[in-house]
């Protein structure tokens, strides 16, 4: 019975507590809660009695809410708030009037288009027993000077950004101060005045904002190009060297002016003394041909016509003048060659027997000549120039793809041959003609240097091998890629035929050149290599052949040069070989 009585008492107390709480909730006036920063929440844990309340649907925590009112600045015009209005705010009533824009926020900076272009709007007046003092747009709004609306906590603006860049509303790029980087890029720079407003102590700080070097360092200014680094100064122009120091005993035309030409030169028709040729006045000449210097330079192919006065223009050799229309006409060349013919004194045609035998063609393969072409008397080989020329025949590698190695003894043999040839009347007359045409100077050394350069300068015919020269090609022979080339001298042909290495196959054409020589066009094979067409002088001296080829190469390179020997007209064909800035003799032979 005691237990039942206690249970009944406990049940009654529980029901009484439950009804009391329900009645309290029904009578409570609900209002909009304040912001979190204006609400202070105190939580109290329930006692053991709260467990029974929770069991019957009641919460066991008691929440006490107190509003922290911001400090209110009173003014003489402020209206005194009644205790009733301060303790219990009236219920929130939403007006049915149309909503009005509140305008920009009070802390909107001047860089924002919303804060700079229009005046702030006044918010609608709520029914309240208090009246706040309006703030002027020119002064920063301070929420602590306005009383809060009923049921709302006071407005607290956002804290300013920690750096000096304006991040509000994207007000567009601001003009950057001088030296802070490129204009129109990056974030806009805020003004140098920053205002910090807090809810409790109000502090206004004004000062220069330090430049943030860590975030956006200023770009360096453009560097002007340095003349020393980018555009090095050019060296001072060198003064042209003066005239070379004259060498005793060897006067040179480069050191003395040439005689003034008086009239065009025509080669004399009467032979002069072989020891002392009669000098001819220096003729006038044009610039249709580039003369070949004697020291290391070269000439290009001449393109004037094969007739009389060609019309091309090229550079004239330094130190010479040009006043005519042609360096040399065809008639002048023929007159010169006739003069050379009269000076030919070492012809060996009388000591040679020519056995032409049967005719052939270049396309034939049959042997139309079972016997040798030439039968040479030993007296024909006793001429001083022929003796020195024969010493050069064994100095060459005939394969053009094998490098030539000139020994000192071979170089001496070349010089001895040149000295012997340059001393002959034929070669001296040819050099005198070239001197009159401005191709060479009066200095005899330049004549020799010209002949040596044209005929004995080594060059390459392919694969980078220095294995050819003009003399080797014309007066001996060469083999290029299995083809025989050259072989245009009768002395070497006679030696090879005597040794059984030259097999004569027949002739195609022949022509006598007066009584001092012959020209034959033949077909032959040499050590198993066939040459279908080959033209060669027979019986002429080395100096005459060398003089004809040199003059024609200087005046009519890369085409047929008109020649007349003993009133027999034919042509001389020369080909130039360009190598390392020089025009050298690639080939030369008579053409009938």
Swiss-Prot record:
The active site is at 473, 488, 531. GO terms for cellular component: endoplasmic reticulum; endoplasmic reticulum lumen; extracellular region. Residues 109-120 have a biased composition (Polar residues). Residues 134-144, 188-209, 268-294 have a biased composition (Low complexity). The gene is Arlr. PANTHER family: ENDORIBONUCLEASE-RELATED, PLACENTAL PROTEIN 11-RELATED. Pfam families: XendoU. GO terms for biological process: mRNA destabilization; negative regulation of lipid catabolic process; post-transcriptional gene silencing. Endoribonuclease that cleaves single-stranded RNAs; unlike its paralog EndoU it does not appear to preferentially cleave at uridylates and releases linear products instead of products that have 2'-3'-cyclic phosphate termini. Preferentially cleaves single stranded RNA at sites with AU, UC and poly-U sites cleaved less efficiently. Targets mRNAs encoding proteins involved in lipid metabolism, particularly those involved in lipolysis, to regulate their expression. Disruption phenotype: Viable without any behavioral or developmental defects but adults have reduced lifespan. From 3 weeks of age onwards male and female adults have reduced triacylglycerol levels and lipid droplets are reduced in size. Adult flies show faster consumption of lipid stores upon starvation. RNAi-mediated knockdown in fat body tissue results in adults with smaller lipid droplets in fat body cells. Residues 234-249, 258-267 have a biased composition (Pro residues). CDD domains: XendoU (cd21159). Belongs to the ENDOU family. It is found in: Endoplasmic reticulum lumen; Secreted. InterPro entries: ENDOU, EndoU-like, EndoU_C. Its EC number is 3.1.-.-, 4.6.1.-. Residues 1-24 form the signal peptide. This is Endoribonuclease Arlr.
């Amino acid at each position: 019975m005691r237990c039942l009585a206690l249970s009944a008492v406990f049940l009654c107390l529980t029901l009484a507590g439950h009804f009391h709480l329900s009645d309290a909730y029904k009578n409570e006036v609900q209002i909009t809660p304040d912001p979190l920063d204006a609400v202070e929440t105190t939580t109290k844990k329930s006692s053991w009695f709260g467990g029974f309340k929770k069991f019957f649907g009641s919460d066991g925590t008691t929440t006490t809410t107190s509003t922290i009112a911001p400090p209110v600045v009173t003014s003489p015009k402020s209206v005194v708030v009644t205790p009733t209005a301060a303790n219990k705010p009236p219920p929130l009533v939403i007006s049915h009037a149309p909503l009005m824009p509140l305008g920009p926020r009070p802390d909107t900076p001047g860089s924002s288009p919303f804060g700079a272009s229009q005046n702030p709007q006044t918010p609608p007046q709520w029914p309240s027993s208090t009246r706040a003092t309006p703030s002027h747009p020119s002064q920063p709004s301070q929420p602590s000077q306005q009383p809060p609306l009923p049921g709302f906590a006071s407005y607290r603006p956002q804290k300013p950004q920690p750096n000096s860049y304006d991040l509000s509303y994207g007000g567009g790029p601001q003009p950057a101060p001088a030296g802070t980087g490129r204009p129109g890029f990056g974030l806009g720079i805020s003004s140098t005045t920053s205002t910090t407003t807090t809810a409790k102590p109000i502090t206004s700080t004004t000062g220069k904002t330090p430049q943030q070097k860590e975030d956006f360092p200023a770009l360096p200014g453009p560097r002007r190009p340095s003349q020393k680094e980018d555009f090095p100064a050019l060296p001072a122009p060198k003064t042209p060297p003066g005239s070379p120091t004259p060498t005793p005993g060897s006067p040179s035309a480069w050191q003395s002016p040439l005689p003034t030409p008086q009239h065009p030169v025509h080669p004399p028709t009467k032979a002069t003394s072989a020891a002392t040729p009669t000098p001819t006045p220096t003729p006038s000449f044009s610039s249709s041909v580039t003369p070949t210097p004697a020291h290391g330079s070269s000439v290009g192919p001449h393109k004037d016509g094969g007739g009389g006065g060609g019309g091309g223009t090229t550079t004239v050799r330094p130190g010479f003048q040009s006043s005519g229309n042609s360096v040399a006409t065809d008639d002048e060349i023929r007159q010169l060659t006739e003069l050379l013919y009269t000076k030919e004194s070492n012809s060996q045609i009388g000591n040679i027997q020519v056995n032409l035998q049967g005719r052939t063609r270049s396309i034939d393969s049959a042997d139309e000549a079972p016997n040798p072409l030439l039968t040479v008397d030993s007296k024909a080989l006793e001429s001083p120039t022929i003796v020195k020329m024969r010493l050069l025949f064994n100095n060459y590698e005939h394969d053009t793809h094998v490098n030539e190695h000139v020994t000192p003894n071979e170089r001496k043999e070349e010089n001895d041959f040149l000295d012997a040839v340059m001393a002959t009347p034929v070669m001296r007359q040819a050099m005198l003609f070239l001197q009159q045409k401005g191709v060479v100077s009066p200095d005899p050394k330049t004549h020799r240097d010209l002949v040596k350069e044209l005929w004995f300068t080594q060059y390459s015919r392919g694969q980078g091998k220095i294995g050819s020269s003009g003399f080797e090609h014309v007066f001996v022979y060469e083999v290029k890629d299995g083809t025989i080339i050259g072989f245009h001298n009768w002395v070497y042909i006679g030696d090879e035929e005597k040794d059984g290495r030259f097999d004569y196959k027949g002739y195609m054409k022949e022509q006598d050149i007066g009584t001092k020589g012959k020209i034959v066009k033949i077909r032959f094979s040499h050590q198993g290599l066939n040459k279908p067409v080959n033209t060669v002088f027979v019986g002429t001296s080395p100096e005459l052949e060398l003089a004809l080829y040199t003059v024609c190469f200087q005046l009519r390179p890369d085409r047929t040069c008109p020649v007349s020997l003993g009133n027999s007209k034919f042509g001389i064909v020369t080909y130039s070989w360009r190598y390392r800035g020089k025009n050298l003799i690639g080939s030369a032979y008579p053409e009938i």
